[in-house]
A protein has these predicted regions:
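Small-residue helix/turn framework positions
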Residues: 1-185
Length: 187
């Protein structure tokens, strides 16, 4: 990660800078931002405009993307966050459940992350194009017009390709402050 030169002044409280990112490990970044507990391979590149004001960090249309032609693998352990708070009778629940299951072990051709701050919340959009490594416990049912989760007696479905769009809202500054408090306690 690099940036252009910047001058810090004791009289100034607001700073704007652009972070230029080269080959950041995607899974490590997701962990550090408090999004997911992920493992895997693959790197991201891009630029992230940052505004630092009164101890808070804001992102302004930052983006990171995988190197064209070089994919990776992502295995998310705490994928239950995707369906947390969504009632099972919600029409979108099955789509989110399918995405959650796919992200447990997903091979992607390309990935993109977009960062924006809305008030005190980090709005992160993650786009992945690829396919699940394993057969998923879902089958297409014509009467429902979509996929439904099935039990172990069904063969499930082998997906040839899926584009996943995941929207996350994270209390980023709170996570940073909490991490700093723990660090100061441990030291």
């Amino acid at each position: 990660v690099s940036t252009e030169s910047i001058r810090f002044s004791k009289d100034k409280n607001v700073y704007s800078l652009i972070l230029y990112c080269d080959r950041l490990e995607m899974t490590r970044l997701l962990k550090q931002m408090g999004a997911f507990n992920a493992q895997g391979s693959g790197t991201l590149n891009g630029r992230v405009p940052v505004i630092y004001s009164d101890g808070n960090i804001k992102f302004d249309n930052g983006f990171l993307f995988s190197t064209p032609g070089i994919g990776g693998k992502i295995m998310i352990k705490n994928s239950d966050r995707i369906i947390a708070g969504i009632p099972m009778d919600n029409p979108q629940f099955t789509q989110l459940d399918l995405a959650r299951e796919a992200l447990k072990d997903f091979d992607y051709h390309w990935a993109k992350l977009v960062f924006n701050t809305i008030e005190d919340t980090l709005d992160m959009k993650m786009e992945l194009d690829g396919k699940p490594s394993n057969i998923l416990p879902f089958e297409y049912r014509k009467e429902f017009g979509g996929f439904v989760r099935v039990d172990a007696s069904s063969p499930g479905s082998q997906f040839q390709g899926i584009k996943l769009d995941i929207n996350l809202k994270l209390p980023f500054n709170e996570v940073l402050k909490f991490g700093n408090k723990i660090e100061s306690i441990l030291n």
